[in-house]
């Protein structure tokens, strides 16, 4: 490296996250796209409230994939699954897979939910807006759940199922994406409870 030349850090040494744009203004401050080589902070951002927003989106996805019973605590294995899935996404869509992940998160996070309100012994559902942080958490959970359910008792690997889920969610395809289907279901229930 020559003097004065900038060091370019790419995710897994392959993908640049500086060109990725977040279209949803409410999620801009909650989606971290800081350049990292390997998305592993070893829990540094779990001490304070809302510090998880400083964590790279791919690491948050890895943490949600680790929450399943099979992959609990196996971060290296999950990161290799995500790397393989991002390679499949890049080959299939011919665009930056980190952009596909961000688009999938924007399309699969519900904007409206219901909460249970008890008034005078009578309980009913009330529609409420969802905070951007909860919206992202729900999107991560549904994407990882859709991928693990797709791979369960299937010939497809978890990486292929994750790639399918990310591509379908980035296109907001309700027929193929578990996460988008769940989002639409929650918003439909919330709309009926207005």
From Swiss-Prot:
UniProt keyword annotations, A-Z: Ribonucleoprotein, Ribosomal protein, RNA-binding, rRNA-binding
Molecular function as annotated in GO: rRNA binding; structural constituent of ribosome
Gene3D superfamilies with a match to the protein in the record: Ribosomal protein S7 domain
Entry protein name: Small ribosomal subunit protein uS7
A GO cellular component annotation in the UniProt record: small ribosomal subunit
Keyword rRNA-binding appears in the UniProt entry: yes
Alphabetized Pfam families for the sequence: Ribosomal_S7
The protein's assembly and partners: Part of the 30S ribosomal subunit.
NCBIfam families membership: PRK04027.1, uS7_euk_arch
Database matches in InterPro entries: Ribosomal_uS7, Ribosomal_uS7_arc, Ribosomal_uS7_CS, Ribosomal_uS7_dom, Ribosomal_uS7_dom_sf, Ribosomal_uS7_euk/arc
Role, per record: One of the primary rRNA binding proteins, it binds directly to 16S rRNA where it nucleates assembly of the head domain of the 30S subunit. Is located at the subunit interface close to the decoding center.
GO annotation terms (biological process): translation
